[in-house]
């Protein structure tokens, strides 16, 4: 009987193994390489996931939703460009660590008035795993760094341009108006033949006619746009007149919310713009904190636990009146810049500090010493001794003018650069 039982058990194991292998093979078959991009690939699973994200995010009406073919084409184009830029990041040694990632995710949640837990729940309920969402955000942050590194060196701004814009800002309130624009780009670069240009312009006019008849701009952007924001419904976000490409600024001047303008010819094609929203200049207020801290740096002979114990001991000494915060900072703090001032960091905006330090000075009550916490610099205790609000509306007009000019020129150069790197890449579709 034992032999029979053993034989049955072995048979079950063999059958289970066979079924498992078949299941694994089936799962592997479900994913495949769709496009080879230089040294990398775009997988079918990536395309499917991006299409599902777009469907969940855009809330298309069933009557006018883009076909899966259209969504797949747009998804492939975005993923090709993403893969090219991620490979560039790898060659440049650009990485995003977990602390940077967590800070970015916290900011995303805050901007949506959500906790991180609520954001996670929303992602999971929409069908995306939290791990996949985190990886998407990490990739976006990496690509942003690649773009800054590659494109900012192509942007040139002269002192005269800055001075001229400062004068314009002071004399013309309109330049402070922000526009939220959406774009549909019909691609046609400077090397296109006359026939290709005419065909692209005809497509742009067809899109305009559809918009005149009431078609949804975001739906048409997903269907027709070659722009990098196509899968976001063409949304370009908020920008001032001087922060947008010159062609756009001239086109939207004096336009109202809901107005559609175009087609506008540029070096990369024909643009159709929609003014989604407008807002005027607002008073800018910034929060500053006056803080002091004691820093203990772990080393080969000083463990993290020991550093934490030392800081807890200092907290007890301060609470009992045995020592003052300033005395302990002068005696023990490893921050040479503040130790001689009793740990005083002066007035500063929280975003000046490391993410963990920023979070701590923003959250603790004034005149309260924090529990020990760590940053990339070591272990700290911190006390906020003051808070104030400053009117920064007129602060640093030169910097504001520079940023507006940089933003405008960066957007123009980014489109050109992305077209260039795509043209230079080896891209091959893989037959099914």
From Swiss-Prot:
The residues the entry assigns to the signal sequence are 1-26
Q: What class of enzyme is it?
A: isomerase
PpiC domain sequence ranges: 176-277, 286-386
Q: Which SUPFAM superfamilies does the annotation name? A: FKBP-like (SSF54534), Triger factor/SurA peptide-binding domain-like (SSF109998)
How is this protein annotated for GO cellular component? outer membrane-bounded periplasmic space
Which superkingdom, per the lineage? Bacteria
Task: Tell me the compartments it is located in.
Answer: Periplasm
Chief localization = periplasm
One GO term (biological process): protein folding
Q: Which Enzyme Commission number(s) are listed? A: 5.2.1.8
Q: Name one GO molecular function term.
A: unfolded protein binding
User: Which reactions are catalysed by this chain?
Assistant: [protein]-peptidylproline (omega=180) = [protein]-peptidylproline (omega=0)
User: Keywords in UniProt for this one?
Assistant: Chaperone, Isomerase, Periplasm, Repeat, Rotamase, Signal
Q: Quote the entry's note on domains.
A: The PPIase activity resides only in the second parvulin domain. The N-terminal region and the C-terminal tail are necessary and sufficient for the chaperone activity of SurA. The PPIase activity is dispensable for SurA to function as a chaperone. The N-terminal region and the C-terminal tail are also required for porin recognition.
Instruction: Give the HAMAP family listed for this entry.
Output: Chaperone_SurA
Function statement: Chaperone involved in the correct folding and assembly of outer membrane proteins. Recognizes specific patterns of aromatic residues and the orientation of their side chains, which are found more frequently in integral outer membrane proteins. May act in both early periplasmic and late outer membrane-associated steps of protein maturation.
What protein name does the entry list? Chaperone SurA
This protein's species is: Idiomarina loihiensis (strain ATCC BAA-735 / DSM 15497 / L2-TR)
């Amino acid at each position: 009987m034992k032999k029979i039982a053993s034989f049955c058990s072995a048979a079950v194991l063999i059958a289970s193994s066979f079924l498992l292998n078949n299941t694994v093979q089936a799962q592997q078959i479900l994913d495949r390489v769709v496009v080879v991009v230089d040294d990398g690939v775009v997988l079918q699973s990536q395309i499917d996931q991006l299409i599902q994200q777009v469907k969940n995010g855009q809330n298309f009406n069933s009557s006018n939703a883009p076909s899966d073919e259209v969504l797949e084409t747009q998804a492939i184009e975005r993923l090709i460009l993403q893969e090219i830029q991620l490979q560039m990041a790898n060659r440049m040694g650009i990485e995003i660590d977990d602390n940077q990632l967590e800070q970015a995710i916290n900011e995303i949640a805050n901007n949506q008035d959500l906790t991180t837990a609520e954001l996670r729940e929303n992602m999971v309920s929409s069908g995306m795993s939290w791990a996949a969402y985190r990886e998407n955000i990490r990739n976006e942050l990496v690509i942003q760094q690649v773009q800054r590194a590659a494109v900012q060196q192509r942007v040139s701004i002269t002192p005269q341009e800055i001075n001229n814009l400062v004068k314009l800002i002071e004399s013309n309130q309109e330049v402070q108006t922000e526009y939220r624009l959406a774009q549909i780009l019909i691609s046609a670069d400077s090397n296109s033949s006359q026939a290709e240009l005419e065909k692209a312009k005809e497509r742009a006019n067809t899109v305009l006619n559809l918009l005149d008849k009431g078609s949804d701009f975001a739906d048409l952007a997903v269907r027709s746009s070659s722009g990098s924001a196509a899968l976001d419904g063409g949304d370009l976000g908020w920008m001032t007149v001087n922060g947008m490409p010159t062609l756009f600024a001239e086109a939207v001047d004096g336009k109202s919310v809901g107005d559609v303008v175009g087609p506008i010819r540029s070096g990369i094609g024909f643009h159709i713009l929609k003014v989604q929203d407008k807002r005027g200049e607002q008073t800018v207020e910034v929060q500053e904190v006056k803080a002091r801290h004691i820093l203990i740096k772990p080393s080969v002979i000083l463990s993290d636990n020991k550093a934490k114990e030392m800081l807890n001991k200092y907290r007890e000494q301060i609470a009992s009146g045995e020592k003052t915060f300033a005395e302990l900072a002068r005696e023990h703090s490893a921050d040479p810049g503040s130790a001689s001032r009793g740990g005083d960091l002066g007035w500063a905006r929280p975003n000046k500090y490391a993410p963990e330090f920023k979070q701590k000075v923003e959250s603790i009550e004034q005149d309260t010493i924090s529990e020990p916490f760590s940053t990339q610099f070591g272990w700290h205790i911190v006390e906020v001794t003051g808070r104030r609000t400053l009117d920064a509306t007129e602060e640093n007009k030169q910097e504001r003018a520079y940023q507006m000019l940089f933003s405008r020129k960066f957007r123009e150069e980014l489109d050109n650069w992305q077209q260039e790197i795509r043209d230079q890449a080896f891209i091959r579709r893989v037959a099914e």
